[in-house]
Amino acid sequence: MSSLKVSQQDKKWVNSGSVAILAYCASSILMTITNKVVMSDRTFNMNFLLLFIQSLVCVITLLVLKVLGSVNFRSFNKTDARNWFPISICLVLMIFTSSKSLQYLSVPVYTIFKNLTIIVIAYGEVLFFGSSVGNMELGSFALMIVSSLIAAHGDYLHSVERLKKMLGPNVSFSFIVNIGYFWIAANCFASALFVLLMRKRIQVTNFKDFDTMFYNNVLSLPLLLLGSYLFEDWSQENLLPHVDIDNLSTMIISGLASVAISYCSGWCVRVTSSTTYSMVGALNKLPIALTGFLFNDAARNLSSAASILLGFASGIIYAVAKQKKLQNSEKI
């Protein structure tokens, strides 16, 4: 049995979709901003190590809370681990591609392009769960795509101008600028696969929030450590500049932030649906994007403003469409 130990009167809000959505919004803002702080240095090349530290902090925090009696979740066993391992592989792919995206893209552009994940998930739910996509939803998807194209245009121009000042006008910028879009595209598909498989596996295993959180992170540890050992430079010259006291402190803080996002992700998927979970993230992009303007690499131009507003509008349209579909199904 996995549970947050609360009183009888508090059980109502623990199972409330609106409370889960608000908690997910707050934790996703915290996670995005803390990861951007860590990844803002383009020379940072220890992504797997960063993700390993985040997952390790999350696992240690959970175990400490369990010992203190604040939370309860299933003990580790081989059967559950074997059933959940494919989800952990998807999680590693999702968080790695997310960290690489944040390394090359500004927070506003990153959050806008994450909208495209919703389209992939929506059609994934058609295949996996027999849901349908209506005309209003298609309209919101079209707005998401348009907002992403506008954001990409404004960000490209801003990035080229910034790189010209840094590297000189004679350097080719196409690879440097476009690599971020490759990583965000990979992240969209990895995120969709993770959410869809997790929802299906939760139905099979009857995992609760802390079970999901514990197994997601503990099974990721060997994968992340192996990835760091195989693909990252562990020489003293490379390791010391990236793992000094300031960077290590920020990594630990981002690990604590990952505790919140790990729990709230599983919580939100359990009490709502995987598409609603992703749509909330899309609606949440407005405060995330505005917060992202605190960073110097975020483009402040008309394209950025238009893309954010269009993306936000697409979220509202989608939410209305889902509400109408729910009301129609209740009438039948």
UniProtKB/Swiss-Prot annotation:
Its main location: Golgi. Glycans are attached at residues 170, 247. GO terms for biological process: transmembrane transport. It is found in: Golgi apparatus membrane; Cytoplasmic vesicle membrane; Endoplasmic reticulum membrane. The keyword Membrane applies. It holds the Pfam family UAA. Involved in the import of GDP-mannose from the cytoplasm into the Golgi lumen. Homooligomer. This is GDP-mannose transporter 2. It comes from Vanderwaltozyma polyspora (strain ATCC 22028 / DSM 70294 / BCRC 21397 / CBS 2163 / NBRC 10782 / NRRL Y-8283 / UCD 57-17).
